[in-house]
Amino acid sequence: MGRARRFQWPLLLLWAAAAGPGTAQEVQTENVTVAEGGVAEITCRLHQYDGSIVVIQNPARQTLFFNGTRALKDERFQLEEFSPRRVRIRLSDARLEDEGGYFCQLYTEDTHHQIATLTVLVAPENPVVEVREQAVEGGEVELSCLVPRSRPAAVLRWYRDRKELKGVSSGQENGKVWSVASTVRFRVDRKDDGGIVICEAQNQALPSGHSKQTQYVLDVQYSPTARIHASQAVVREGDTLVLTCAVTGNPRPNQIRWNRGNESLPERAEALGETLTLPGLVSADNGTYTCEAANKHGHARALYVLVVYDPGAVVEAQTSVPYAIVGGILALLVFLIICVLVGMVWCSVRQKGSYLTHEASGLDEQGEAREAFLNGSDGHKRKEEFFI
């Protein structure tokens, strides 16, 4: 169980008058809170103690200690201190039935007592997480989290990918303890298979900052996929080719079938689960090979086109990038280059036309200026003739 923690609050003091005039005795106690299974100390403080009888009783009013002498045979209770200043007892392995008021009684001519209240908290155990029904890609999964016993009622939280999920919680009180449950729903896909969902429980019985957690690994079922990997890119007559059918799916397909189009597999072929071995290749082995896998959620098939070359043939290894994609990229580059060239030619022609227009305009202006100058000169001559 968790370590005991004690929270103490001062009680109202009980003042008792002693028998003799001018004397008074005081008894003071403190309330104690402890986690179930922990250790609690119950203390009675004495003031102006004159040696009178001191009795400690449990909530059932059974005497535990009488003036320092054990009266009840419960070894969980031990007398730690008995002095004129205080009486202190120690309770180990605290239980819910130990909860209640402990009486510290001082017997004089008038009996006086004070009560120390013991409160026992129950820390939650690790939550129990269950799934309502099998999760399938594209659907929803519902998880439930249960803490059957806690006091006070535990607070439940859900986390997924370090983010809190909103759950619906409910609680039921059973005697002194609470049973708390929470449910959460969310949509799942195949990428969620193997993901972690956490249910966390907290209450005051746990140390500050601590919690009890349970991790649930998502099991999401989905249809299979298949892909064929070849042991080499270029094969020639006489080579041995190994084809591997890489299959995924949940549940994982337990049977893989190999075929070659509408023909049967070569007699030399060895099909063993995910691998197909073709030894001593010849041109007659050419064809389209397929692997097929299925589970209850779907079916998958992968293709591989086998081309067996002559031993002396010079060929390039097959690329994983389809030729159509490469051709499309090249066509796009050529188109962009043509667009750039057309734009450059158009800009050049426009700039040249603007320059010729400006030059012609300049010539017109110069002609007009020259004509004006000549006209101006003739007028001057006429003026000279007039005055002569």
Swiss-Prot record:
Alphabetized SMART domains for the sequence: 4.1m, IG, IGc2
Extracellular side of membrane: 25-324
Domain (Ig-like C2-type) ranges: 124-219, 224-307
Subcellular location: Membrane
Gene Ontology BP, a term: negative regulation of vascular endothelial growth factor receptor signaling pathway
Xref: CDD domains: IgI_2_Necl-4
Processing and modification events after translation: N-glycosylated.
Membrane protein topology class: Single-pass type I membrane protein
InterPro entries reported in the protein's UniProt record: CD80_C2-set, Ig-like_dom, Ig-like_dom_sf, Ig-like_fold, Ig_sub, Ig_sub2, Ig_V-set, Neurexin-like
An annotated GO cellular component: cell-cell contact zone
UniProt domain Ig-like V-type: residue ranges: 21-119
Cytoplasmic side: 346-388
Membrane-spanning residues: 325-345
UniProt keyword annotations, A-Z: Cell adhesion, Disulfide bond, Glycoprotein, Immunoglobulin domain, Membrane, Phosphoprotein, Repeat, Signal, Transmembrane, Transmembrane helix, Tumor suppressor
Endpoints of the signal sequence: 1-20
Glycan-modified residues: 31, 67, 286
Function: Involved in the cell-cell adhesion. Has calcium- and magnesium-independent cell-cell adhesion activity. May have tumor-suppressor activity.
Assembly with partners or alone: Monomer and homodimer.
Protein name per its UniProtKB record: Cell adhesion molecule 4
Species per Swiss-Prot/TrEMBL record: Rattus norvegicus (Rat)
Designated gene of the protein: Cadm4
